[in-house]
C-alpha cells in the first residue's frame, strides 16, 4: 500500500494539470519540499530576483494583462524560445515547487495543460476573469487610471478634427485626453486630477527591438536629423529602410520634433508617390522609423552620377519626374499638409522588379493606377518638415530651394512653396549649376529667373518651369494643375477629345432610345383604342397563327406528298 500510494503521488506530481485545489490536504508536505528545491537551485532563485529587480515599471493595467495572457508575452520575447537547456537550472521532476503566493505564478517557466493553465490563471488574477486582457481594454476603469493612460497617448496634430471627434469619443463611453482638457467648470474635479502631459517616447521605450527584429545590411544615408540603414526584417524576410534619429529624445520639445514625421506618415497612409510608412518606436531614447526601401536610391544620387559622366536627365524623363512628384504633392496637399522640404535628396527612386511569373498584359483603367505599368517610380520622402496648411508651424527647409515668401513669414499660400522647390529641383535634374544658398544669385532666382540649364528644352516646358518659380505664389500652378498640364501629358488632350466624342455618341444614343420608346408608346395606344370585337377577332387570328400558321408550314414540308389517313 505504501508503494502504491507513492506511485499515485508521483503520477499526480508528474501530471502538469495537477492544481493547488487537488493538493490542499498535502499542502504542508509540498511546502517543505519546495524549500528543498529552492536550496538545490540557488541559480534559479537568483535569476528570478534579478529579473524582478531590473523589471521596468509597469502600469497596473499592463501588469494584469500579462498575468492573464502569458502566451502573448512569450511571443513578444523570441529569445526565451532560443535558450538552451544548459542555461536552465536542473530540478527534479518529482518535486515541482508550488507557486509562491507572494509573487505572481511563473506561467512561462513550466508547461501546463489547458486545465492546469486555466486554474493557475484564476488563482493569479483573483476576482478578475481569466481572459482579462480584452475585458480590461474594453471596460472603463477608474477615472484616475484612465487619465494616467490617456497621458501616455499622443494626439496627432494632422488628424482632421471632425475625424478625431467622430472616432475617438468611443460613443461617449470613454473620453480622450482632449475631451478631459476641454471639460467645463462642472467637471472641475476631473481637471484637477488630470496628469501632466508625459513624454510618451520615453515611457514606451523598447529595448533591443532593432537587433531582435531586423538584420542590418548597410548604411544608406546620413542626414541632419538621422541615419538611414538598409535592413531585412527577420520575420517576413523583406527589406526596409530604418531611420534612427541622431539626437536622443530628452524632453517634450524634442519628442514633438521627433514625432513630426511619424504623425505625417501615419495620417497620409499609402500612396504610390509617397514613401510608405510601416512602424515607429523609441529605443535607447532615439526615434526609430521603419519605412519603405527604395532600391534606386535618391534623385540627388542619380544627379551626381550623371554629372560625373557629363550626362543629364533629358526632357521626357524630366517631365515624367515632374508629373509623378506632382501627383504625390497633390495627395499631400489634399490632406491639408505641405512638405516644406522638396529637393533632390528627398525624392527617391523605385525600379520595378521583374516578376518570375508569366507577364499578363494589363491596361490602366483610370488615372490612379497608370503607375502600375511604369518601370521607374518617383516618391516623396523625409516628412520631417511637414506642417499643416490651416495651422502652420513652419520650420524652414533647405535655403537653396526655399521660396522668398516663407522667409517673409507669409504663410497664406504654403502649397505654392512646394511648387517653387519642385521647379528648382527639376532644373537641377536638367543639369543646372549648383544653387546658391544666399547672395545676389539667390535673389535673382527669387525674381523668377531660372538658373542656367545646359540643354535645350522645349519652349512650353521651359515656360512651365518659370511659372513654377514665379515671385507671386498665386501665379504658380498648383499640384493639381500640374497633373492636368498638356505639357506633361500630351495624350491628355487626345483623351479629352475622345471623351467628348464618347459623350456625344452617348447623347445621340439616348435621344434615339427616347424616340423609339415614344413610337412604341404611340403604337400601343392605337391598338388600345380598337373595339373589343375587333380585338377578340385579332386575338383569335393571332392565336390561330401561333398554333397553326408558322408551325403548320414547317410540318407540311415534312409531310409533302404523303396521303392523309
Curated annotation (Swiss-Prot):
One of its GO terms (cellular component) is cytoplasm. It catalyses: L-tyrosyl-[protein] + ATP = O-phospho-L-tyrosyl-[protein] + ADP + H(+). Ovary-specific. The active site is at 341 (proton acceptor). Its EC number is 2.7.10.2. The modification Phosphoserine is found at residue 77. This is Wee1-like protein kinase 2. It is an enzyme of class 2 (transferase). Residues 521-534, 553-565 have a biased composition (Polar residues). Keywords: ATP-binding, Coiled coil, Kinase, Magnesium, Meiosis, Metal-binding, Nucleotide-binding, Nucleus, Phosphoprotein, Transferase, Tyrosine-protein kinase. A motif (Nuclear localization signal) lies at residues 173-175. Its main location: nucleus. Phosphorylation leads to increase its activity. Residues 495-521 form a coiled coil. Mg(2+) binds at residues 346, 382. It comes from the Eukaryota. Changing residue 149 to A: Does not affect phosphorylation. It is found in: Nucleus. InterPro entries: CC_SR_Kinase, Kinase-like_dom_sf, Prot_kinase_dom, Protein_kinase_ATP_BS, Ser/Thr_kinase_AS, Wee1-like_protein_kinase. SUPFAM superfamilies: Protein kinase-like (PK-like). Gene3D superfamilies: Phosphorylase Kinase, domain 1, Transferase(Phosphotransferase) domain 1. The keyword rRNA-binding does not apply. It holds the Pfam family Pkinase.
Amino acid at each position: 500500500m505504501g508503494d502504491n500510494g507513492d506511485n499515485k503521488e508521483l503520477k499526480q506530481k508528474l501530471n502538469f494539470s495537477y492544481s493547488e485545489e487537488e493538493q490542499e490536504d498535502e499542502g504542508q508536505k509540498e511546502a517543505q519540499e519546495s524549500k528543498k528545491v529552492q536550496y538545490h537551485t540557488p541559480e534559479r532563485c537568483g535569476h528570478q530576483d534579478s529579473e524582478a529587480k531590473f523589471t521596468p515599471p509597469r502600469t497596473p493595467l499592463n501588469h494584469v494583462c500579462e498575468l492573464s495572457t502569458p502566451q502573448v508575452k512569450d511571443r513578444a520575447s523570441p529569445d526565451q524560445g532560443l535558450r538552451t537547456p544548459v542555461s536552465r537550472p536542473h530540478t527534479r521532476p518529482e518535486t515541482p515547487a508550488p507557486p509562491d503566493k507572494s509573487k505572481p505564478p511563473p506561467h512561462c517557466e513550466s508547461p501546463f495543460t489547458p486545465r492546469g493553465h486555466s486554474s493557475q490563471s484564476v488563482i493569479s488574477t483573483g476576482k478578475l476573469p481569466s481572459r482579462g486582457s480584452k475585458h480590461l481594454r474594453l471596460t472603463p476603469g477608474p477615472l484616475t487610471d484612465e487619465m494616467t493612460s490617456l497621458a501616455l497617448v499622443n494626439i496627432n496634430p494632422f488628424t482632421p478634427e471632425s475625424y478625431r471627434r467622430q472616432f475617438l469619443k468611443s460613443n461617449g463611453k470613454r473620453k480622450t485626453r482632449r475631451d478631459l482638457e476641454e471639460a467645463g467648470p462642472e467637471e472641475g474635479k476631473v481637471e484637477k486630477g488630470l496628469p501632466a502631459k508625459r513624454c510618451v517616447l520615453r515611457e514606451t521605450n523598447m529595448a533591443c527591438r532593432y537587433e531582435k527584429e531586423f538584420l542590418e545590411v548597410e548604411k544608406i544615408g546620413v542626414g541632419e536629423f538621422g541615419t538611414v540603414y538598409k535592413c531585412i526584417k527577420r520575420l517576413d524576410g523583406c527589406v526596409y529602410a530604418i531611420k534612427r534619429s541622431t539626437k536622443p529624445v530628452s524632453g517634450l520639445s524634442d519628442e514633438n520634433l521627433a514625432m513630426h514625421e511619424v504623425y505625417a506618415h501615419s495620417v497620409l497612409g499609402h500612396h504610390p508617390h509617397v514613401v510608405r510608412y510601416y512602424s515607429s518606436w523609441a529605443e535607447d531614447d532615439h526615434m526609430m522609423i521603419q519605412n519603405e526601401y527604395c532600391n534606386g536610391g535618391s534623385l540627388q544620387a542619380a544627379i551626381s552620377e550623371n554629372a560625373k559622366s557629363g550626362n543629364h536627365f533629358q526632357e521626357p524623363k524630366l517631365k515624367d519626374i515632374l508629373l509623378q512628384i506632382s501627383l504625390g504633392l497633390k495627395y499631400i496637399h489634399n490632406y491639408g499638409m505641405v512638405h516644406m522640404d522638396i529637393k533632390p535628396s528627398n525624392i527617391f527612386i523605385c525600379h520595378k522588379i521583374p516578376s518570375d511569373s508569366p507577364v499578363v498584359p494589363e491596361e490602366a483603367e483610370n488615372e490612379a493606377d497608370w503607375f502600375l505599368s511604369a518601370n521607374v517610380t518617383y516618391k516623396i520622402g523625409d516628412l520631417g518638415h511637414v506642417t499643416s496648411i490651416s495651422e502652420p508651424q513652419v520650420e524652414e527647409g533647405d535655403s537653396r530651394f526655399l521660396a522668398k515668401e516663407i522667409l517673409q513669414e507669409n504663410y497664406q499660400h504654403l502649397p505654392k512653396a512646394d511648387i517653387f522647390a519642385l521647379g528648382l529641383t527639376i532644373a537641377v535634374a536638367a543639369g543646372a549649376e549648383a544653387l546658391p544658398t544666399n547672395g545676389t544669385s539667390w535673389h535673382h532666382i527669387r525674381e523668377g529667373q531660372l538658373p542656367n540649364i545646359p540643354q535645350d528644352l522645349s519652349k512650353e516646358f521651359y515656360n512651365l518651369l518659370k511659372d513654377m518659380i514665379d515671385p507671386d505664389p498665386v501665379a504658380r500652378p498648383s499640384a493639381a494643375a500640374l497633373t492636368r498640364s498638356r505639357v506633361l501629358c500630351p495624350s491628355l488632350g487626345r483623351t479629352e477629345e475622345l471623351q467628348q466624342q464618347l459623350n456625344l455618341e452617348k447623347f445621340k444614343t439616348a435621344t434615339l432610345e427616347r424616340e423609339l420608346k415614344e413610337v412604341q408608346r404611340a403604337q400601343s395606344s392605337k391598338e388600345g383604342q380598337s373595339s373589343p370585337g375587333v380585338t377578340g377577332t385579332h386575338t383569335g387570328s393571332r392565336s390561330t397563327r401561333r398554333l397553326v400558321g408558322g408551325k403548320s408550314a414547317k410540318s407540311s414540308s415534312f409531310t409533302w406528298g404523303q396521303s392523309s389517313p
